[in-house]
Amino acid sequence: MKRVLNWMVLVLLLAGCSKPAPPPAASAEPEALSRTEFTKRVENFFEYEPLHSGKPSQVRIHLTDLSDGSPVENAVVTLGVRRTGSADSVVQTTSRVGKVTGIYVAELNVPSPGNYDIEFHIKNDKLDERMPLSNFKVE
């Protein structure tokens, strides 16, 4: 009996000496924000990295033509950024066409923190849509 008790104590001591599991590694990339907005002709689902002044943020834009449900092809997609309540554009950028039809990628670099509005202008042979959106916070 004494021998069994000694073995149990030894096993418990050895188990207590093991290292705890390391914490999971922190994600290097910030979590993307997303929104879905509509006009009468276009669905715009877009994802973007949190906006920080002076740092570029990628915007991934997924466009669908609501007249037939197809991806919006060969469009020029321009994003105009202005301070909330102002008519003057602070930044304007044109997206590049993504690898998949209907997906476009833009990079925004807003120079100073504050509240902003972004207007998406989507233009191709079939569409010429403007989509003014608000409630973008730049930190």
Regions found by a protein language model. Give the residues of each.
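Sec-dependent bacterial lipoprotein signal peptides
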Residues: M1-G16
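Intrinsically disordered, low-complexity terminal tails/loops enriched in metal-binding residues
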Residues: G16-E139
